[in-house]
């Protein structure tokens, strides 16, 4: 049975609708990757609880991003078509530096996808979608990329992963204080 057309749909191009569905999948994938990272650092043989908390928070944030896009899709009269979520590229995140580098790469990919979605919305003359992406995503992405870049820099300066104490201290003193602000 074909999906009936929405009575609320207005100025919402099919290409934008499809791109929003792809972005939903990417946000869910990012959430899945962060969830994997979180529970890796929660293992008894890794035991970096603030890395685990940090990545769990990131996972929840990415899932919220997906849900916000799903809500937008319904508000605009689009249809949500969920796809399979790819498994993370690895199960063993090795160490904090590797995980932070992977997270930085992931956030840059998510940001690039959002920029492409914004470009498409501009080309299809959809100011509402442009505003939505600008308001809810772009600034937050830039801040996340900067934060992860800073974490990578500090872990490298501390000698991670060569010196295990560096990760322990970063976990305790940097990530351990991030939830107090």
UniProtKB/Swiss-Prot annotation:
GO cellular component, one term: cytoplasmic vesicle
Taxonomic superkingdom: Eukaryota
Gene3D superfamilies reported in the protein's UniProt record: 1.20.1260.10
EC numbers for this chain: 1.16.3.1
GO MF annotation list: ferric iron binding; ferrous iron binding; ferroxidase activity; RNA binding
GO process terms (BP): intracellular iron ion homeostasis; iron ion transport; negative regulation of ferroptosis
Spans traversing the lipid bilayer: none
Keywords attached to this entry: Cytoplasm, Cytoplasmic vesicle, Iron, Iron storage, Lysosome, Metal-binding, Oxidoreductase, RNA-binding
Induction, per UniProt: By duck hepatitis virus type I (DHV-1). By polyinosinic:polycytidylic acid (poly I:C) which mimicks viral double-stranded RNA.
Pfam families found in the cross-reference section: Ferritin
Residues binding Fe cation 2: 62, 107, 141
EC category: oxidoreductase
Ferritin-like diiron domain mapped to chain residues: 10-159
Binding site for Fe cation 1: 27, 62, 65
Tissue specificity annotation: Expressed in erythroblasts (at protein level). Expressed in heart, liver, spleen, lung, kidney, large intestine, small intestine, muscle, glandular stomach, ovary and oviduct.
Function summary: Stores iron in a soluble, non-toxic, readily available form. Important for iron homeostasis. Has ferroxidase activity. Iron is taken up in the ferrous form and deposited as ferric hydroxides after oxidation. Also plays a role in delivery of iron to cells. Mediates iron uptake in capsule cells of the developing kidney. Delivery to lysosomes is mediated by the cargo receptor NCOA4 for autophagic degradation and release of iron.
Protein name per UniProt: Ferritin heavy chain
